[in-house]
Amino acid sequence: MYKTILVVDDEESICQALQGILTDEGYEVRAVGSGEEALKAIEEDPPDLVLLDIWLPGMDGLEALKIIKSENPQVQVIMMSGHGTIETAVKATKLGAFDFIEKPISLEKVVLLVNHALDLVRLEEENKLLKQKVTSAYELIGQSKTILELKEMIRIVAPTNAWILIMGEN
């Protein structure tokens, strides 16, 4: 499955450069020029990663970041800025940004950061699937009166630190 990236920058040359290099790396890339357009694009088809400029017309990147992370917490966001400060980078990170990159952008660094962020996405998906497998592997099946009573007892004792031994056939 192709990983999808949304580039959000009001400078068309930056969008084109990032779109070109990331497409060459095998990613499916879309580009928009404002925070509002980004939110609409994410609502229609959430990407795996967003490259988001801080200084955008209308809604700025930090406001867009807040909304993106509240509505789509699984989407990784890398912030970009030509006038960034340490305070801005810290604020972006606290709001949920994966990383912060300063302009002029080193395309090598962007590719490296994108790969790391998408590795994190892959690991989170894998972790979720493994947890589901473990849960379903040890799930009690059946709807008999005895099984339902057993499930109720387990539900009651589960929050405690007590050791429980369940014995019976099979």
What do these predicted ranges mean?
Residues 85-87, 101-114:
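C-terminal output helix
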Residues 15, 54-60, 81, 85:
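The feature encodes the CheY-like receiver
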Residues 40, 62-74, 91:
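Short amphipathic alpha-helix used as the core "switch/output" element in two-component signaling
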Residues 45-51, 56, 78:
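Active-site beta3 strand of CheY-like receiver
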Residues 131-170:
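AAA+ ATPase active-site-proximal loops
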Residues 33-37, 60-63:
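Acidic catalytic/metal-coordinating carboxylates
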Residues 12-30:
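Two-component/phosphorelay signaling modules centered on CheY-like receiver
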